[in-house]
Amino acid sequence: MRDAVLPGGGWWHLGLHCRAWRVAQQRKRPAGRHGVAQILRGGCRPQRASATGGNVEAAPRIAMVAGETSGDMIAAPLITALRKRLPRASFVGIGGPRMQVAGMESWYPMETLAVRGYAEAVRSVPQILAIRRELARRLLASPPDLFVGVDAPDFNLGLEVRLRRAGIPVVHYVSPSLWAWRGERIHLVKRAVDKMLALFPFEQRIYEQAGIPVAYVGHPLADEIEPVPDREGAREQMRIKPEVPVIALLPGSRRGELEQHAGLFVETAKLVAGQVPGVRFLVPLTSRATRLQFEEAQYRHDARDLPLTILFGHAQVAMGAADVVLVASGTATLEAALLRRPMVITYRVPRLTWHLMWPRRRLPYVGLPNILTGEFVVPELLQDDATPANLAQALVNALRDKFVRERQ
């Protein structure tokens, strides 16, 4: 088990890194708030006639594919920004609810692509491959003026190779984690994209060294989240008194993640509730399916009386109101860091997936705050270390540390 208590000043250290990262984004990002949109509007290749016979600038048709909630969250503001600059643009492909609200026509349910790991993927491979074949057929039959693959590299890169070979300009938004594992994918990326849009500054160097056109555009969360989070406002919104200890539980957005984490998080909450009088738990979930999974876990683990509120979305409000966050590794760890919330990062996958993936890792940590700082500033309890007892102790320690600091 990794140390569950951070060394003195750990959270402050993370805060400094987050502040420095915000400044770096402001300095290096293309001019204007929507730098990504400007890059896309500028194009990757010489301007050409639209597939529909008109001028690309007049009415471009842009295809996009996002494969999970984090991609939906990142791509929706991009669509909004592009529509402001190109009012007649149309957007098609695969996207989630935010992208659809922003004006995209989604041809397939995004949730179908939201799988992670070998064991989970095996069950879904036939359906995912069928969708990719049909999507490629539709896009090649009626070529868009631009294709933007949003994360989801296992789905998008293969599709992008086919589209680029057919002369369709391709941009990939959100770099695959080449720096963490499967670095050999850089060769596939080189065949697949005209330009990579990187969220983090260290990723830009990787692509420049490989001769792949790249732009560091920053992470949209750094614009979205206020530099000084409003804890009191978040608590008022949740109708929680200032003195109540609150823990936000974020078990993930995929159904596969809930299969691994729902029971674990419920058992952890039960242990914490037995040690921290008056504690409240907030659980933001992204879909009815994941909400049902979590509620079923409450019943299975006899935890219906837990002081727990399930929210539909509102993850940032839940984390903003919390004293400590228990979070599955992913984009939510970056949100918690930008909100300056102490957190414990955890993750579980099926045992086969773990044994196949873990030996191929390049870094000793998985959480974005630790990757960005280059050291363990946030505790990670993964796989066999991710037990209810270990997680509960880490959360209780983090709560006690917070209250001690506030009294000093």
What label would you give each PLM region?
Residues 52-408:
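Nucleotide-activated sugar donor-binding and catalytic core shared by glycosyltransferases
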Residues 1-53:
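An anion-binding loop in the catalytic cleft
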